[in-house]
Amino acid sequence: MLAIISPAKTLDFESAVPKFEFSQPQLTEYSAQLIDVCRQLSPAEIGSLMSISDKLAGLNFARFAEWQKAHTEQNSRAAIYAFKGDVYTGLDVESLSQQDVLFAQQHLRMLSGLYGLLKPLDLMQPYRLEMGTKLVNSKGKDLYAFWGNVITDTLQQAIEAQGDNVLVNLASDEYYKSVKESQLNVRIIKPVFLDNKNGKYKVISFYAKKARGLMCRYIIQNRLSEVEQLKGFDLGGYWFDPTSSSETEFVFKRDVAE
């Protein structure tokens, strides 16, 4: 079983990280091509392209300039410890054991606009490049055109290494669009998280993002290997609703936010 999640815009390159044998990102040849494109942009162009403030545009202009193809523990950080956001709040990697993180290294992947696909312990340098960014490049008008089949092929290899051909899609639509689902030889399960608001169950973005992280945590800590085991997810007060679910979409509901 392999789970995929989105990255986060907020990064942490300051706090202490446990000692691990870190891995290298697999697709840096492609990352370097994107960096070359981004280095041609002025801070103002970066701000306009990404709809961010002048301050953030300046920061990312500097990040693109400083990015190096060689990833070391001096200039990089393991992806699972670098991303901070709602999904990663739910995952709460800091409280996972070393064995949990090593399990995640085999069973979790993060989609990325710059790196394509990351393993949890892959070293990455600070960047901001969301998958939906309309960055014109040699392959086309945006990052979906740039990545083409690369992410899908890399993901297929990772799934085959699991031996059970099951993909749990916990990524946002923006990022999952980079995966060509029809080309994957795999059973795909999409968990959906609904919260009760005024008597109706609906997706509430903040809660749903955190729940995706909680589901990752559940898979990791319980060493899940069977699709049916996903239905036992009960973190944060969620429960599996079989009547709203299908073969491919597992619906989890919650009445009161915890």
From Swiss-Prot:
Q: Which organism is it from?
A: Pasteurella multocida (strain Pm70)
NCBIfam families given in the database record = PRK02101.1-1, PRK02101.1-3
**GO annotation, cellular component aspect:** cytosol
**A GO term (biological process) for this protein?**
response to hydroperoxide
The disulfide bonds in this chain are none
User: What protein is this chain from?
Assistant: UPF0246 protein PM0066
Q: Which domain of life is it from?
A: Bacteria
Family of this protein: Belongs to the UPF0246 family.
Question: Which InterPro entries does the record associate with it?
Answer: YaaA (IPR005583)
Fetch the PANTHER family from UniProt: PEROXIDE STRESS RESISTANCE PROTEIN YAAA, PEROXIDE STRESS RESPONSE PROTEIN YAAA
